[in-house]
Amino acid sequence: YILVPLFNRMFRLQAGANDELIDNCDLPYYMAASDAIFIQRKDVLNSANIPLAFLFHKVAVGPDTGNMGELLNNTGNPTFCPDNKADIIRALEEARQLAAWGKGEVNYEYAMENMSIKKIGKMYVQLYESTSLK
């Protein structure tokens, strides 16, 4: 978070995006203004960014790895091979098209049905009850 912005400034590199971190207070505005949420992480198995994107009525695009890839594939959201630039571009283009077709609304409905606090809470209770010693 520190070296990349300094490197970019030192060599006057511009990657097309601001290298400053987005303040948490401003994040909802960025989310609302976007058509799709791009999850660029390469080496993680899961991400809270997917439910976040769904709850903001957005298409989520992420790597086809771990739980992220499974959830994105199961919900019809684009995935990509993180080491393949052409595949990333394809997934982003697919996300743009899906957003225009209203996929974000479908994602929101999915999140409300399957990712609500009430439902997840019940699942935790069931898990603890099934594994507790009696």
Predicted features by range, described:
Residues 39, 53, 59-62:
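Short hydrophobic beta-strand element within catalytic cores of glycosyltransferases
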Residues 74, 78-86, 94-100:
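Conserved acidic donor-binding segment of nucleotide-sugar-dependent glycosyltransferases
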Residues 1-25:
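Nucleotide-activated donor-binding/catalytic signature segment of Leloir-type glycosyltransferases, i.e.
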Residues 41-43:
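Aromatic "clamp/platform" in nucleotide-sugar-dependent glycosyltransferases that forms part
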Residues 22-34, 51, 55, 69, ...:
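Short acidic alpha-helix that forms the nucleotide-activated donor recognition element
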